[in-house]
Amino acid sequence: MSDWSALHQLLEKVQPYSTAGGKVWIKVLFIFRILLLGTAIESAWSDEQFEFHCNTQQPGCENVCYDQAFPISHVRLWVLQVIFVSVPTLLHLAHVYYVIRQNEKLKKQEEEELKVAHFNGASGERRLQKHTGKHIKCGSKEHGNRKMRGRLLLTYMASIFFKSVFEVAFLLIQWYLYGFTLSAVYICEQSPCPHRVDCFLSRPTEKTIFILFMLVVSMVSFVLNVIELFYVLFKAIKNHLGNEKEEVYCNPVELQKPSCVSSSAVLTTICSSDQVVPVGLSSFYM
């Protein structure tokens, strides 16, 4: 479970940059998939090949029939599914960290530029306005959440889309390989079996229950992804149409003095003493 805990810790870091649906999806992934895979499901399939027997003594027949019945173990397929559906979220987290790092660099650069501009008198405002092209679009806070903007929004939507695609793809793979139920007897006619033989699976009913449970969890995750995708699209369109004129651009440094007048072009503030005061880094989420 230590490896799964590391994955869970990474996914937990995405929560501040996710919607409520994304947070629920992470809980569903960890509680109903990772915990079960690491405990009950793994133990249920521990005797999968050892207890697979066929009514023949022909050497190699059981191995060939087992390979035909289960090209890949259910547990290993579900592990791959967890990894694949987690990758888009982790890539979104990497993009978030990249943007944060770039903003930190921009903040340091502008702090140095503003210090120089402060001592250059009237040229300070002109120097400051040179950086308007570097300003990032900010989001305002609403109900404790953060509004996604620009490329981060596109990355988040892409991560939801690919998670949905992977969910459907793995469901189709599972259905194509061995369906969603297991029978107690598997009929095999593969060579080197001398004739048609019957092979017997261990605990087929228990495994079928787990298979159906994982199927339900996959479908719930898919529905959550679809709902979240439409929600994010709706909010993005609504914010674009309703708040287009109210969007602000700001410098990634902290506003310190209150007795200042804001510029109409950017959230850059010029004080009465001609001192340039940096403006705070607003988040790119709401």
UniProtKB/Swiss-Prot annotation:
Expressed in testis. Residues 42-76, 175-209 are extracellular. The chain crosses the membrane at residues 24-41, 77-99, 152-174, 210-232. Its main location: membrane. InterPro entries: Connexin, Connexin_CCC, Connexin_CS, Connexin_N, Connexin_N_sf. GO terms for cellular component: connexin complex. It is found in: Cell membrane; Cell junction, Gap junction. It is a multi-pass membrane protein. Keywords: Cell junction, Cell membrane, Gap junction, Membrane, Transmembrane, Transmembrane helix. GO terms for molecular function: gap junction channel activity. Residues 1-23, 100-151, 233-286 are cytoplasmic. One of its GO terms (biological process) is cell communication by electrical coupling. It comes from the Eukaryota. It holds the Pfam family Connexin. Belongs to the connexin family. Alpha-type (group II) subfamily. PANTHER family: CONNEXIN (PTHR11984), GAP JUNCTION ALPHA-6 PROTEIN (PTHR11984:SF42). One gap junction consists of a cluster of closely packed pairs of transmembrane channels, the connexons, through which materials of low MW diffuse from one cell to a neighboring cell. A connexon is composed of a hexamer of connexins. This is Gap junction alpha-6 protein. It comes from Rattus norvegicus. The lineage of its organism: Eukaryota, Metazoa, Chordata, Craniata, Vertebrata.
